[in-house]
């Protein structure tokens, strides 16, 4: 609901507003990771239930703020008068939903697994993996969105180069023998994927005007599905590869455990999402060029 609300607000630069909105997610992510890591490290993991209660408080405050806020008038459905080509419009929305799905896959595969990956595949202590891996991932994700809000333009090129960058980073994470280089690549994924979710919303607003709240709901569903599907898929891949005989044999050659082989193979498979994203964006450029 927040995205269409912000989009409905009068603004001289709606792209900037959308980017700033989504940058707050990154800053919140950083806060949660650092506070939770320090709490579990110094207070004790046995007191985790108090941490859960603590993080329930911001949600309560957010609910109160949303309840008392004055919301702008929003277009709940598309305007038939302004709809020139319904078939083209519907296809455009489907393409945008597919794009945000792939973007969410690329972003959340790493954000969900970076802590476990640095601990198990790179043999780093969990506390350092959380702080230097997950936290820096979120910091750069937030800073990139903030930077785009101030200086960014040409969202199509941003999305395309972001997908390409994500492909490169995932490949480095998967095949690099250096733990430091792999960790840096994990963090840089945060930069590359930072604009994929908000950027697709911006692209939709530019190419499919007067979409209405329903379109934002579809976009949110596509993004949420990608954020769930990709990390779960990686988990299934890691579990199955780790117990395979060929993973044991490869591990003996590369001096890796079967689980480490599973993680690296999973990260290599994860490149399929940004690769498909590059192909999709190339098609979308042709599609919108015919509008």
Segments predicted by a language model, with ranges:
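Interfacial helix-cap and linker-helix signal at transmembrane-aqueous boundaries
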Residues: 35-45, 118-119, 151-152, 234-246, ...
